[in-house]
UniProtKB/Swiss-Prot annotation:
Keywords: ATP-binding, DNA-binding, Metal-binding, Nucleotide-binding, Repressor, Transcription, Transcription regulation, Zinc, Zinc-finger. Binds 1 zinc ion. One of its GO terms (biological process) is negative regulation of DNA-templated transcription. A zinc finger (unnamed) spans 3-34. This is Transcriptional repressor NrdR. Belongs to the NrdR family. Its cofactor is Zn(2+). The lineage of its organism: Bacteria, Pseudomonadati, Pseudomonadota, Betaproteobacteria, Burkholderiales. Negatively regulates transcription of bacterial ribonucleotide reductase nrd genes and operons by binding to NrdR-boxes. The gene is nrdR. PANTHER family: TRANSCRIPTIONAL REPRESSOR NRDR. It comes from Burkholderia cenocepacia (strain ATCC BAA-245 / DSM 16553 / LMG 16656 / NCTC 13227 / J2315 / CF5610) (Burkholderia cepacia (strain J2315)). Residues 49-139 form the ATP-cone domain. One of its GO terms (molecular function) is DNA binding. Signal peptide: none annotated. It comes from the Bacteria.
Length: 159
């Protein structure tokens, strides 16, 4: 594989691991010319459905867009990159399992929100506020109240 830093063709695999969800192989590589290290991922290439946007246009499913939107919602939150990758892999699996050739962007947004809900409550609220186009504070309060009803009361932490 070509080095992304110096473009040299000779790189060695230093470490290989199966990702958390088993859907990819993570490889650490070292360039023999510049000695820099980088990470690559090996995944099975599958035919994911086209995304039908609200205006009716169609676009190819882009994993990078899902990862980027989740990373934005999770910015400065204590969630590992591997957890994001695993969540995106679950979304892809759900899309593949439908067998459909198209998925509405609204459905895709709901899948992302479901994954964020399991990863981080704050990220879920951030994403929901943009995705559902919150217009006032009461909509934030509604989502927070929904979480309070869904989870049992927690005892306050001692400081």
């Amino acid at each position: 594989m070509r080095c992304p830093f110096c473009r040299h063709d000779d790189t060695q695999v230093v470490d290989s691991r199966v990702s958390e969800d088993g859907a990819a192989i993570r490889r650490r590589r070292r360039c023999s010319a510049c000695d820099k290290r980088f990470t690559t991922y090996e995944r099975v290439e599958l035919s994911l459905p086209f995304v039908v946007k609200k205006d009716g246009s169609r676009t190819e499913f882009d994993r990078r867009k899902i990862v980027a939107s989740m990373q934005l919602a999770l910015r400065k939150r204590p969630v590992a990159a591997d957890a994001i990758d695993a969540a995106v892999a679950r979304i892809e699996y759900q899309l593949l399992a439908t067998g459909e050739r198209e998925v509405r962007s609204e459905k895709l947004g709901e899948l992302v929100m479901n994954e964020l809900r399991g990863l981080d409550t704050i990220a879920y609220v951030r994403f929901a506020s943009v995705y559902r186009r919150f217009e006032d504070v009461s909509e934030f309060a509604d989502v927070i109240e929904e979480f309070r009803r869904a989870s049992p009361a927690k005892t306050p932490r001692k400081r």
